[in-house]
Amino acid sequence: MKKILLIILLSIIMINAQTPTAKSILEKIDENMVSENQVVVSKMVIHGRRRSRTIKSKSWSVGDSKNFTEYLSPAREQGTKMLKIDDNLWIYTPSTDRIIKISGHMLKQSVMGSDLSYEDMMESGELTDSYDAKVVGSGEIDERDCWIINLNGKVSDLAYQKRKIWVDKTKYVPLREELYAKSGKLLKRMDLENIVKIDGRWYPTKMIFKDMLKSG
């Protein structure tokens, strides 16, 4: 009986030793996903009911507080610019030659007709600064072993107070995120794909964003 009990205790100790803490996982995610300065050329494909369209842009970021984005194509969006400084966001549209500050309820509006809102774009910074985390299980995304982690906001100014993330156990990059309302209702889901190494960091080069409240 003592031998069996000893084996069980040793097994529990080994399992605990192999599973890092939720906080240490978040710290490694932040190391991969957050950089001091970056330049990103991106392509956003928006799938509508009747047609799809592609929007190209280029962004410059300084830390998590400053970001400037210029839309390059198509012609209708070309020259549109967005400037984010801390919690402030401004948009310039060449068709009206006006600068508009996006605030309040306007932050929930769609960006270029996509499922991404301005509020989503304002989300930045390190997860460890904004959320308390708990490992709730393991799973698989595209045959990659993942930790499943629940995040609960520890600051008030978050677009999503509750999140669930599936984190690659080898590369420490989220492969899926579910974003929830305070009530627990699922609002949006993001799948992160094509993970590549850039300057020693693992980073997703494709993100699929879906509003779960929309049908189809």
Regions found by a protein language model. Give the residues of each.
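Sec-dependent N-terminal signal peptides
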Residues: I4-I13
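Bacterial Sec-dependent signal peptides at the C-terminal "C-region" and cleavage site
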Residues: I12-P20
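N-terminal mature ectodomain segment of secretory-pathway/periplasmic proteins
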Residues: P20-S95
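Solvent-exposed coil/turn segments that connect beta secondary-structure elements
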Residues: V45, V62-D64, L72-P74, D87-N88, ...
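Acidic/charged, solvent-exposed loop-and-adjacent secondary-structure segments enriched in E/D, K/R, S/T
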Residues: P94-M122
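Gly/Pro-enriched, hydrophobic low-complexity segments
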Residues: R98, I102, M122-S124, R144-G216
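Short, conserved active-site entrance elements at the starts or edges of catalytic domains
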Residues: S114-N152
